[in-house]
Amino acid sequence: MASPSVSMSAPSSPLYHLDAARSDEQRRYMEELEAAGVCVFCPEHVATHHREPVEHAGRHWYVTKNDYPYEGAAAHYLVVSNLHVVSFDELPDEAGAELWAIKRTLKSQLEPTALATVERSGNMLYNGGSVAHLHVHLVALEKEPSATVRFRVSTNA
């Protein structure tokens, strides 16, 4: 299994937006990590604090399944920045090309009926995110037209 490695900036506080947790279990875990000052997505912590293994590690991103997948998703992957940043503006341009290549690869492997990409960049208190570390959700949708996957793009949703 691949393991990501890139040096990171010092994590900012807060690391987690607890009100964005989708379950009590997720909220409790985020509280524990926040108290310990651990960002679950920083490369040096992902192997010990994220349940799902890293399936691919690139120069700018690594890929893992979401520990808390969206209800109704056939598959839910996270493409996580190797750097502790919150915005795409903080990454070099070549990170975008690598992200697109990862998305194409996952789409060809999953062969979903449809694929939703959720990109929350910037302040998690406004974009509905739960972790202050840039990551992209790739959600493969069920083959049944009645299947619904909902995700939050605002804390007011």
Model-derived segments and spans:
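HIT superfamily nucleotide-processing domains
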Residues: 2-157
